[in-house]
Protein backbone atom coordinates (compact mmCIF):
# COMPACT_ATOMS: atom_id res chain seq x y z
CA UNK A 1 0.00 0.00 0.00
CA UNK A 2 1.55 3.36 -0.98
CA UNK A 3 2.06 6.00 1.68
CA UNK A 4 -0.34 8.93 1.80
CA UNK A 5 1.13 12.13 0.37
CA UNK A 6 1.60 13.55 3.88
CA UNK A 7 3.89 10.66 4.82
CA UNK A 8 6.04 10.97 1.69
CA UNK A 9 7.02 14.51 2.66
CA UNK A 10 10.44 15.08 4.20
CA UNK A 11 9.81 16.60 7.61
CA UNK A 12 11.94 19.39 8.97
CA UNK A 13 14.06 18.29 11.88
CA UNK A 14 17.17 16.21 12.24
CA UNK A 15 16.26 12.67 11.16
CA UNK A 16 19.01 10.99 9.13
CA UNK A 17 18.28 9.46 5.73
CA UNK A 18 18.46 5.64 5.92
CA UNK A 19 21.41 5.42 3.52
CA UNK A 20 23.61 7.48 5.89
CA UNK A 21 23.41 4.98 8.77
CA UNK A 22 25.85 2.11 9.39
CA UNK A 23 23.38 -0.78 9.54
CA UNK A 24 25.95 -3.09 11.16
CA UNK A 25 26.13 -0.77 14.21
CA UNK A 26 23.27 -1.42 16.67
CA UNK A 27 23.72 2.01 18.29
CA UNK A 28 23.54 3.79 14.94
CA UNK A 29 20.42 1.93 13.82
CA UNK A 30 18.65 2.44 17.15
CA UNK A 31 19.59 6.13 17.18
CA UNK A 32 18.41 6.58 13.60
CA UNK A 33 15.05 4.91 14.22
CA UNK A 34 14.34 6.83 17.43
CA UNK A 35 15.28 10.13 15.84
CA UNK A 36 12.95 9.44 12.91
CA UNK A 37 10.10 8.28 15.16
CA UNK A 38 10.27 11.51 17.16
CA UNK A 39 10.77 13.92 14.24
CA UNK A 40 7.34 15.47 13.78
CA UNK A 41 6.37 18.22 11.36
CA UNK A 42 2.90 19.65 11.82
CA UNK A 43 2.89 21.05 8.29
CA UNK A 44 2.98 17.56 6.77
CA UNK A 45 2.02 15.18 9.60
CA UNK A 46 -1.56 14.80 10.76
CA UNK A 47 -0.46 13.38 14.12
CA UNK A 48 2.75 12.35 15.90
CA UNK A 49 2.22 8.73 14.88
CA UNK A 50 2.91 9.63 11.25
CA UNK A 51 6.63 9.70 12.12
CA UNK A 52 6.49 6.04 13.18
CA UNK A 53 4.79 5.13 9.93
CA UNK A 54 7.59 6.94 8.05
CA UNK A 55 10.15 4.94 10.07
CA UNK A 56 8.38 1.75 8.96
CA UNK A 57 9.34 2.56 5.36
CA UNK A 58 13.09 2.93 5.98
CA UNK A 59 14.18 -0.70 6.01
CA UNK A 60 15.51 -0.22 9.58
CA UNK A 61 12.70 -2.29 11.14
CA UNK A 62 11.83 -5.98 11.06
CA UNK A 63 9.01 -6.64 8.63
CA UNK A 64 6.70 -7.67 11.48
CA UNK A 65 7.32 -4.46 13.44
CA UNK A 66 7.05 -2.30 10.30
CA UNK A 67 3.72 -3.96 9.42
CA UNK A 68 2.43 -3.35 12.94
CA UNK A 69 3.28 0.35 12.70
CA UNK A 70 1.80 0.71 9.21
CA UNK A 71 -1.52 -0.88 10.21
CA UNK A 72 -1.88 0.63 13.71
CA UNK A 73 -4.46 3.36 14.07
CA UNK A 74 -4.30 5.63 17.12
CA UNK A 75 -7.44 5.48 19.26
CA UNK A 76 -7.73 9.23 19.69
CA UNK A 77 -7.19 12.33 17.61
CA UNK A 78 -4.14 14.48 18.41
CA UNK A 79 -4.65 16.49 21.58
CA UNK A 80 -4.16 20.05 22.73
CA UNK A 81 -0.38 19.83 22.64
CA UNK A 82 -0.38 18.85 18.95
CA UNK A 83 -2.92 21.56 18.17
CA UNK A 84 -0.71 24.16 19.85
CA UNK A 85 2.30 22.95 17.90
CA UNK A 86 0.26 23.02 14.68
CA UNK A 87 -0.83 26.60 15.35
CA UNK A 88 2.88 27.52 15.19
CA UNK A 89 3.57 25.22 12.21
CA UNK A 90 6.11 23.44 14.41
CA UNK A 91 8.59 20.67 13.76
CA UNK A 92 10.75 18.87 16.31
CA UNK A 93 14.45 18.44 16.74
CA UNK A 94 15.49 15.31 18.59
CA UNK A 95 18.34 14.68 21.00
CA UNK A 96 19.21 11.28 22.42
CA UNK A 97 21.22 10.40 25.51
CA UNK A 98 22.15 6.81 26.26
CA UNK A 99 20.66 5.64 29.54
CA UNK A 100 22.02 2.14 29.89
CA UNK A 101 20.58 0.07 32.70
CA UNK A 102 22.70 -2.43 34.62
CA UNK A 103 19.86 -4.95 34.24
CA UNK A 104 19.97 -4.72 30.43
CA UNK A 105 20.64 -8.09 28.81
CA UNK A 106 24.12 -8.52 27.37
CA UNK A 107 24.41 -8.24 23.60
CA UNK A 108 24.61 -11.47 21.64
CA UNK A 109 25.61 -11.94 18.00
CA UNK A 110 21.95 -11.59 16.98
CA UNK A 111 20.20 -9.52 19.68
CA UNK A 112 20.92 -6.17 21.32
CA UNK A 113 18.92 -3.90 23.61
CA UNK A 114 19.53 -0.17 23.79
CA UNK A 115 18.04 2.44 26.08
CA UNK A 116 17.89 6.18 25.43
CA UNK A 117 16.34 9.29 26.88
CA UNK A 118 14.60 10.90 23.90
CA UNK A 119 13.99 14.65 23.95
CA UNK A 120 11.89 16.22 21.20
CA UNK A 121 11.85 20.01 21.14
CA UNK A 122 9.14 21.72 19.05
CA UNK A 123 10.16 24.79 17.05
CA UNK A 124 7.57 26.93 15.29
CA UNK A 125 8.19 28.53 11.95
CA UNK A 126 7.20 31.76 13.72
CA UNK A 127 10.33 31.42 15.96
CA UNK A 128 8.29 29.95 18.83
CA UNK A 129 9.83 27.13 20.91
CA UNK A 130 7.94 25.04 23.45
CA UNK A 131 9.06 22.95 26.38
CA UNK A 132 10.66 19.71 25.20
CA UNK A 133 8.87 16.38 25.44
CA UNK A 134 10.95 13.62 27.03
CA UNK A 135 10.54 9.85 27.07
CA UNK A 136 12.60 6.83 27.98
CA UNK A 137 12.89 4.43 25.04
CA UNK A 138 13.91 0.78 25.08
CA UNK A 139 14.91 -0.58 21.68
CA UNK A 140 15.28 -4.26 20.79
CA UNK A 141 17.45 -4.92 17.74
CA UNK A 142 17.95 -8.24 16.00
CA UNK A 143 19.95 -9.54 13.04
CA UNK A 144 20.41 -12.83 11.26
CA UNK A 145 24.13 -13.20 11.87
CA UNK A 146 27.31 -11.32 12.78
CA UNK A 147 28.12 -8.73 10.15
CA UNK A 148 24.55 -8.45 8.83
CA UNK A 149 22.30 -5.43 9.30
CA UNK A 150 20.64 -4.75 12.63
CA UNK A 151 16.87 -4.24 12.49
CA UNK A 152 14.67 -2.71 15.16
CA UNK A 153 12.19 -5.32 16.33
CA UNK A 154 10.49 -3.30 19.04
CA UNK A 155 10.46 0.14 20.68
CA UNK A 156 8.94 0.52 24.12
CA UNK A 157 8.58 3.96 25.69
CA UNK A 158 7.81 5.27 29.14
Where are these regions (language model features)?
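Juxtamembrane and targeting peptides
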Residues: 1-44
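Structured, amphipathic secondary-structure segments that form assembly/contact surfaces
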Residues: 46-158
Amino acid sequence: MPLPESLRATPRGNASPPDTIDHTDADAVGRGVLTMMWTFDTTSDTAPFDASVRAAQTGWLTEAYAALLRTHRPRAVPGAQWQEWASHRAHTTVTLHKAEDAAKPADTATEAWRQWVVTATPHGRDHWTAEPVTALAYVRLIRKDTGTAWLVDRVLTR
